[in-house]
Amino acid sequence: MLPVEPHLETWSRRPSSRSGRPPLLFIHGGYTDGWCWTPYFLPWFASRGWPAHALSLRGHGGSAGAGMLFATGLDDYAADVERVAGTLKEPPILIGHSMGAAIVERMLAMHPVRAAALLAPVPPTGLVPVAARLAVERPDYFAHMMGLDPMRLSADVLEALRPFYFSDRVDRDILQESAKHLANESPRAILDLSMRLHWLKPERNGAHLMVLGAEGDRICTPQDVRATARHHGVEA
């Protein structure tokens, strides 16, 4: 792990009145930052009585650490989540998407977690089979992702990525804002995600766990989601 503890960008939406419900902490996936939770997830849960929080992992969004991004691994990201969780009034429920779900899995094995949800998680076999499938089925998407440069996003790149990351019903303004939050990802973290077959049998330390995916997801298929659920001994 890296020795530094960089400044981390956070967002919070709180209920209008006390509900007694524990806080939620959302962890984003790769190639983006914590802003992705702000249009829908944070306000939706806050309006229903859940204190909702999100962070940008180091090297993403407004968080520091971009200079060391190339050497940043999942354990470093897990340390970021642990730091932010420690600032909350009580232990949060962790909710991670894709790479963020893998970070949550790391934390489940490290120490007790109140409860957790894995949204469209990287499957137990890692990223390599996923990348191989996409290279065959959607070479246009695969080529764009391999050469993604967030500073030079062309219209054809965004059009190729849209059906993989956004609903057809997404608001155009949110779609355009989302493009501003695309970012490079750590090669070390991608390697960690690619080597998941070498992980030990996962430990949940008694935590309640939900594994959730979407039927129309073109990257994390329903089969991938069910494989992760079986890996943890739960139903998707």
PLM features per residue range, with description:
Residues 44-66:
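Conserved alpha/beta-hydrolase
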Residues 62-92:
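Active-site loop/oxyanion-hole signature of alpha/beta-hydrolase fold enzymes
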Residues 112-148, 187-196:
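Flexible "cap/lid" loop of the alpha/beta hydrolase fold
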Residues 29-33, 98, 215:
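Active-site glycine-rich loops that stabilize anionic/oxyanionic intermediates
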Residues 205, 211-213, 217:
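Short beta-strand/loop motif that positions the catalytic acidic residue
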Residues 218-227:
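Conserved alpha/beta-hydrolase "acid-adjacent" motif
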Residues 30-42, 223:
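The serine-hydrolase catalytic nucleophile loop
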Residues 151-207:
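Alpha/beta-hydrolase
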